[in-house]
Amino acid sequence: MYSSSNSFMGGANSARPGQPPFMQQPSYGQQTTQQQQQHQTGLAPQPNGYGSQLSGFGGSHLQPQPTGFSPGQLQSQMTGFPQLQQQPGFQTSAQPPQLTGYSIQSQAPQLQVPSSTGLPVRLAPQTSSEIADSFRGSAGAAPPPPPKTAGSKIPNIRLSFITAQDQAKFEQLFKSAVGDSQTMSGEKAKDLLLRSRLPGSDLSKIWVLSDTTKSGQLFFPEFALAMYLCNIRITGRGLPDALPEKIKNEVSSMVDIISFQVPDTQPEMAFPTNAPKFDAPLLENKSAPPAPQQPQPQQPTHSQLLTQLTAQPTGFHTQPTGIQSTQASFPGQSSSLVPQATAFPGQSQQQFLQTQPTGLMSNPQPTGYSGLRPPVPPMPTSLGPNLSPAQTGGVSGLVAQPTGVPGQWGFVNAPSSGLPNIEALKQQLMPQPGREGGFSAAGLSGNAHIPWAITKEEKKIYDDLFRAWDGFHKGFIGGDTAIEIMGQSGLDQKDLERIWTLADPHNRGRLNMDEFAVAMHLIYRKLNGYPVPNRLPPELVPPSTRNLNDSIGTIKSMLSQDAESRKASGAFLQPQKTGVSYLKDHSFRGGSGVSPGFGRKDATLFKNNDEAASGYRSSARRRVGNNGRTPSPATSQTSEEELSVGQLRKKIRETQIMLDAVDFQDENRAEEEDALDRRDRREVESLLDRIRRVQDDIDTHPDAAFRNLDNGAERRSLRRQLQSYEDQVPQVASDVRRVEREIAEAKLELFRLKDAKAHPNSASNIVGTGPGGAVTEADRIKARARARMQARAAELAGRPTPSSQEDDGAAARRVEAESAKVKADREKNDAMTRDVEDSVKDFARSLEDTLKDASENSTREHERRRWEDALGVEDVIRDFIYDLKRNSRTAYVRKEEASRSMHEEHERSRYDEAPATRPSPPPSTGSTGSLPGSTHEDRVAAARERAQKRIAERMAAAGLKPHNNTAETLLQRQEREKKEREDRLKQAEEEDTRREQERQRRLAEEQGGSMAQPAKPASKKPPPAPPSRRGRTDSAGQAEAKRAAEESAIVEQAAREQTIREEEEAQQERKRLEDDARKREEEFQREKEAQEARLRALQEQVQQGKIKKQEAKRRKEEADRLAKEQEAKLTVQRAELEMAKERERQLQLELEALDEESSSDEEGPENITPQHSTPGQSQILPEVDIAAPVAPSALVPPVPGPEPDRPTSATSSPTSDRTGLAHLPLETESKNPYFKKISLPAESQVATPQPISKAPVTSPKADVQSTNPFHRLAQQQENAKPAFTAAGPIERVSRARPEVDDDWSAAGSDFDSSDDDERPGGGSAKQLASILFGTMAPPRPLSAMDDKSPSKPSTPAPDTPVAASTAPEADGTLSIPSASIPPPPPPVVAQVPSIALSSGPPDAPPPPPPPPVPHMAPSAPPPGIPPPPAPPAAPAGAPNRSALLASIQAGKGLRKVQTNDRSLSSVAGRVLD
């Protein structure tokens, strides 16, 4: 019994790694010696037997068993065993445990049986078939082993991760490679896998994943998995780091099925499964101690087992006989007996057999002899505890058994270790309903093929599932919840009921974690094709239930047997001095490894032998070593008491040394970790520095602005654009179809028309009025009526009657044929349209997929958000990323500032180069380019900054102070203003110098031209001395002044308008951006100072430019005004002289020859030249210029001007002229300086010198008319009379005749003669005066004629009308302003020159000399000028000049004569009409 119980424990341990073989463990004799010392003398034969057992290994040891055990001893043993049987914790009989022991012993291949026993020596473990056959036939004839081919069968289980065809191919390949074997060796697998030509690293990983059992060989599912993984790698996919749970479960399940289906053909595979399946029936049989027959009952029937076991109790000799017969029937039974010795380490079979008689016979005695003599109980007491530990796990061996149970539940990967058998045996020994029933060998063998153990992975899965459903952590799951969970499996209700019954053996109506795992495992096995067992397999008994029951039963049995043995043997008198400790040493938690007195190992504590020499270990440190079971609170009181103080101190020192060593190791480990941490930190810092440097390089790169362009935004815009195009496709297709329909209808209509022409009488020409153009009956009736009328009309007209109408069928057929043709074309086009539409859709879909794949990559988006937006990273990394972003933004701002400063420098240089050509500084609006920002915020900030800068510039241009320019102090502002003034002065000086140089250049050109001018008309008639040098100079200056005035006016107006606009915009934008600027202050505080500096610089530039321009404008205006006033004075003075001289000349010419052409041959150029110019001064009569203003001033009062529209004549006072000069440029400004005064009334035009400065406009007309000098002379004579009244008409003439605008430049024309010299001032009043004075000079050949006419000015009545008439005729188109003037009497001679001046540059070709007098009369408004000026007498030499001066000085007399002349001239004018 002892060996039986311990064999279960030892058998379990023997199968575990790290446990010594049975033969190496301490002999059982030592333990039995201790036991014998405790027993009475009746037990002495037992030690003797043991001694013999220890002494040798012979069959004689079996004899000492009967010899050593007297009947009394047997009775005493039986006396103890009935107690064991009576205990509720041990309901099973003692004999089946012997068989149980045998079953476990059959697992130990190390044991040998001496030849004396008659048992053959078996190094390999027996299979269940062999053991069953040995039971069946005592003769020892073993049945023939099953065919090996049965093991090569592959279960018909479908693997889900490969196809059926692939699985069939893999099966064929596997069978061809392994033959009858169930596994493929590593070499064969290597040869096959190398054919895939995959790298060695991949094949190594595939092998690691495929070899799930880690056995170095592959089962078929593992081979199929390897081929599947090879296929994955060959197709380019990556290998997984771990197998998916589904594939792993399928492979492991199929491997279990294969490995347990063929235990007989491969003993090494069936070895782990034999024990548990054999244990189960033995436990159910409840046979207690006789362990030697444990492994056998898997195959034999229950009756055979009982028969063999009953032989033992019938008689002592029968028992050894039975044992021997059992050994005889078992070729390997000796090994099974030795496994009992496995419970007693190091014993051989003979020893173990002796041990069996020694202790087992006590066990057999209780089995067969219930109630023998009392001396035996000490033996059963000692054995009983040993048995109890074997059953309950109370001893260290039992500790291994409960350890095995958890191993099956999660600490063992497969049930092949034999532990399931031991635990099944222990569970069978526990009182459970239904365990007393017998089992057939078939049932036992069936159980042996099914592995019911729960692996660690499965247990973890079940526990997680339980925790998930146990939301309130109650520790159990109720029936309703379990029904809900288990109902999801899809099993039948009957199967679920059976599973529930098995999982809830106590009928509590709820399942704890272990029971729930059992239920789930049964469901899992049922789903995998396993039948639901009728009774719960021992491997599936929850450890909590089994351990609790075993513990309770063990304690009860130990207490009862100990008390009984002590009472019978008297050992209670010295419980600690007997050498055997029943309670302390037999700790069912295995806390102590040393027996109390003698230092010998108790049979129940053999498991701790290997660790006994390792020194002291506390219970806390031992806890994990005992496979999770909590050791006893104290290792052993006896051992503690027996340790001396020195030993304890030694142990303490050793422990202290160990602790110090551990602490030292911990410190070393901590130091190493610190060193590694420091190294890692250094590496991290170096990497961060590298990242920063790379980021800086990126930011400073010229193309850095393009790296952060939002490709996603562009891609989204492309997708939106693509979507818009896709939306247009249906509409386009609809339009195409509509057009196709229209085309088809048009074709049909065209065919009908053609058919109607070709067959006029056919019905095809009937126009249908029905829906869709269908021909109705009414249409046919109308067609027939129309045909009849056509026939009658033909008959009446005598025409041949039209041929008979064709039948409607022919026309319908033609129409139908054409319709079919058109329809076919239409369908063809529709098909093409559909194809195009489909292709467009496909193309759009491909484009959309491309854009979507590039943009909607979740991994890329996650990485971007993680490493760019710092989402989901540690704080250190997030701070680092933010720091990089700040540095990038700062680098971008610096780069933008640099580019902006460069741009501003460029603009400033441009501004300095041409400050006067720009009305306002444009850099303010575009000084900063739209450089793309690295981020959206940067772009927004840059836009705001540019807007703020524009606002500041506009405000500066408008004269407003920017609101944010608060950093400028008073001193800075003063310095800035001082600098601005200096710059303005400098610029003004530069402009004056440049203007003076230009003026000097023009003067030099005019002087050079005037020197060459007189030579041209010399061939015809020597013209008067050209006094045009000074006049031209004045004319050029006047033109320059005029241009400057116009330019200044334009600039001022543009500046004013732009200033107003900018001020308004600045005010609006300032209001809008004040809040934004206020918010940006904190963010851009660092950039603000530089920005304000730039703004101040720009503002200073703008203000300086404005001030410079304003100063220049004012200077130009002042200069122009002064020049105009002077010119006006000179104009008035010289105009009077010109009028007088011109009138005298005209009278002389009229007297000499009526033919104007002959008389104008010499004076034509002289008359034409001054038409557009007003001579400023005369070289001949400088004094006249000074005295001339006096006469006009005296003549001004009497000029009440009969024309209200012309209040002042050309001879109005210089004051009025000055006023007109000062105000006209502003009043009548225009883009075209030559058309400014067109809209002004004639009187303002006459009074202002503006028409004089604009005289060059009409110079081309004189040039055009200069082809005929006589006509020009006549025109000059006609126009010379109203010299002062044509200022307004000149403007209108120039506008009405713009064909010569190309020569209207007043800058540099030298119109000295009538030939080809055209100067802008040629027709001006100054030039005319110069010519007039020139004619007075002595060299003039016409001086004699001038001498004849000094007296004519007083009586020019007959001549004035003629002059007046000729002037208007030449000036016919220029007298528009005079049309509104009332017709007062024609002006006196003094008025004639003004007309000539004004109309000098007539655009109309020279008309015939006699112009209409009525037209002349309106143009006479200049009568305000006194007609009697004596200048007519001056044309002839010095006397004429003196007479002219005298007449000019006599202002009042002239005024008085003017009145008389006016009446005379009016009469003369009427006579001329």
Swiss-Prot record:
It is found in: Cell membrane; Endosome membrane; Cytoplasm, Cytoskeleton, Actin patch. It comes from the Eukaryota. Residues 166-254, 458-547 form the EH domain. Residues 810-837, 893-915, 935-953, 973-1005, 1054-1097, 1108-1128, 1135-1147 have a biased composition (Basic and acidic residues). Residues 1152-1165 have a biased composition (Acidic residues). Residues 1-121, 134-153, 266-366, 609-645, 793-837, 891-1265, 1277-1473 are annotated as: Disordered. Belongs to the PAN1 family. This is Actin cytoskeleton-regulatory complex protein pan1. It comes from Aspergillus oryzae (strain ATCC 42149 / RIB 40). The gene is pan1.
